[in-house]
C-alpha cells in the first residue's frame, strides 16, 4: 500500500501542491471536516517548537482527531528505543498517522518504506520543512494569485535553513525566480535553486522579502563577529523597508529575532505577513492531514498524553 507521507517538497508534483493549497483555502474559508470515527494521531517532537507543534495540534483538533502528545524525555527513547520501534509501537496500539520533528537530516529515509502509517515531516535538521513551505506558498498565492513571474528574495542564514531549501525548490518549480542574500559564511552552495545577489540590490526589485531566522543552535560556535553587524548588513532595517517596491510583502518563518533579521517595528507593519503565515499554518496542516487520512470527517475531542 502506498503511504501518503509528506516528507519533502521535491516529492510533490505541481498538481499535488495545488490540491493541498485548494484544500487549505477551503478550510481558510470556513469549510469544516470531521472524522466519522475515533482516529488517533501522534505528535513526536524531538526538537523544540511553538508554531509548528501547536499549529498541528490545533489542526488535528479542528478535524476531530484524538491527539497523542509525545514527550521524548518521558518516553522509552530515553531507554534506547529506536524511532522505528517507537512508530511501530504507536501503529500497533491504533495510531493512524505520526507528525515528526527531528534533529537528524532525512531521519525518514530509513522509516518511510518500513512503517504502515503516514509520516508527516514537521522539520528534519537542516533538511526539509514541507508544511512551512506550503503555508508560505498559500500566503504568497493569497497575496498575488500566482507564482509564475514573481521575484522572491530568501535572506539570511541560508546554509542552516530547511525553510530556504524547501521554499527555493518549490517556488522554482512553480515558476518564481529565487534570489539569495546571505553572509558569506552562511551561503549554501548546494542549493542551486537561486542566485546570490547583494541584499541592497534585491530590496527594490523583489515581490517577496522572505527573511530567515539566524539559527544559533545549528552553528558549531556562536559567530559573534557576524552577529554584531548582522542587522545593519544583512537584516531588514527600516531604511531598507522604505526602498521596497509598492505591493511587495515581508515574510518570516518565525520565531523572529527582533532587530536582528528584521527591525522590531516592521514585524507587524503594513507589508508584513508574518502572523498571516502562522494563521495559514493551521489550514495547511489540516489539508495535509486530510491528504494523509482520506477518511477525515468527524471524531473525538479530548487529548491524551503519552
Swiss-Prot record:
GO terms for molecular function: amino acid binding; aspartate carbamoyltransferase activity. It is an enzyme of class 2 (transferase). InterPro entries: Asp/Orn_carbamoyltranf_P-bd, Asp/Orn_carbamoylTrfase, Asp/Orn_carbamoylTrfase_sf, Asp_carbamoyltransf, Asp_carbamoyltransf_Asp/Orn-bd. Keywords: Pyrimidine biosynthesis, Transferase. Signal peptide: none annotated. Pathway: Pyrimidine metabolism; UMP biosynthesis via de novo pathway; (S)-dihydroorotate from bicarbonate: step 2/3. One of its GO terms (biological process) is 'de novo' pyrimidine nucleobase biosynthetic process. Coiled coil: none annotated. Pfam families: OTCace, OTCace_N. GO terms for cellular component: cytosol. Its EC number is 2.1.3.2. Belongs to the aspartate/ornithine carbamoyltransferase superfamily. ATCase family. Heterododecamer (2C3:3R2) of six catalytic PyrB chains organized as two trimers (C3), and six regulatory PyrI chains organized as three dimers (R2). HAMAP family: Asp_carb_tr. Catalyzes the condensation of carbamoyl phosphate and aspartate to form carbamoyl aspartate and inorganic phosphate, the committed step in the de novo pyrimidine nucleotide biosynthesis pathway. This is Aspartate carbamoyltransferase catalytic subunit. The lineage of its organism: Bacteria, Bacillati, Bacillota, Bacilli, Bacillales. The gene is pyrB.
